[in-house]
Amino acid sequence: MLGVIVACMQDMSSYMFGQWDTPLMVLIFFMVIDYLGDIVNAAVEKSLDFKKSYMGIAKIVSVLVVIIVSVLMDRLVNKGTWFFRTFTCYFYVANEGINILENCSKLGLPMPEKLMKTLEDLKNR
């Protein structure tokens, strides 16, 4: 019975998010790192606030909803290619990457300019 439930959940997530490829995996990884970075920065600044933490989770859920919308658009318009979903993933990867670098910078870590520029270029495409 548990196997059937797990299989149904896998099928449902595959339908909602499309193929589990590199852009989607990088986006999810970046969102987790950004969320954890926000928590670390808030702890260092002694301004840890559960309301802000919940807003971070709401932001992640909202991004995932946008990904689902882009997958459904691809299913409707592109019939098997992930154009909208990949574009959306790249956009949010750039946003999350910039946020991660900003979080590290707040902790006093120097940032490679080329990496920041590449993320900004990706965001503006």
From Swiss-Prot:
It comes from Clostridium acetobutylicum (strain ATCC 824 / DSM 792 / JCM 1419 / IAM 19013 / LMG 5710 / NBRC 13948 / NRRL B-527 / VKM B-1787 / 2291 / W). This is Uncharacterized protein CA_C1842. NCBIfam families: holin_tox_secr (TIGR01593). The keyword Transmembrane helix applies. Keywords: Cell membrane, Membrane, Transmembrane, Transmembrane helix. One of its GO terms (cellular component) is plasma membrane. Its main location: membrane. It comes from the Bacteria. Signal peptide: none annotated. Belongs to the bacteriophage holin family. Cp-1 holin subfamily. The chain crosses the membrane at residues 22-44, 54-73. InterPro entries: Phage_holin_4_1 (IPR006480). It is a multi-pass membrane protein. It is found in: Cell membrane.
